[in-house]
Amino acid sequence: MPLLLALLCLLSSNSWARRPSKKILENIERSSEALLASPPKDNEVCFAPDEACSAKLVKFIQTAKHQIDIAIFEMTDRKIAEAIAEAAKTVKVRMVVNRKLVKDTGPAYDLVRASPAEIRVGKQRGIMHDKFTLIDEKRMETGSFNYTYAAGNSNQENQLYLSTSSIVARYQERFDKMWREARH
């Protein structure tokens, strides 16, 4: 749909006769990648901004059947927030976030906060800088990727999707500890 809208805008404006800018072409390419994004496979890596990592994360969130546990430092990407809020209607969603995210709320975080998702603030001396998502205690995503528009569209970021049970179990133990110690 975004690809179609972008093309219609190009054709309906007076600029259709001019050569589209590099930025317009990049946005069209990224939109088409997002449309074609499939849920991540086991042991898959995604590198932003060259790949549709935000769309891949949305697809990953949409695969949850029972529970999603998220530890995230920052969130400004509305599409990711919408996927979390939508998932929270049908599966248990728990989030541990950095205290700055709670203070500096924005539209994306507000969407999740208004949903049935349970959110707690990480308790630690410094910042809660983790970035990982656990799905159904069986699969996970981790890496440098924050839930931000910049992470998916301009920053050099990485995501790693895993289902190795021993690794997922370690992250689940870590999340459960963070959850118990976090502030409501």
Task: Label each region the model flagged.
Residues 15-17:
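Boundary at the C-terminal end of the N-terminal hydrophobic targeting segment
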Residues 74-78, 99-103, 125-127, 139-140, ...:
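Solvent-exposed loop/turn segments at secondary-structure junctions
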Residues 52-56:
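A short, well-structured juxtamembrane/interface segment
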Residues 21-50:
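N-terminal low-complexity, Pro/Thr/Ser-rich intrinsically disordered segments
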Residues 57-118:
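Primarily the HKD phosphodiesterase
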Residues 2-10:
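Bacterial N-terminal signal peptides
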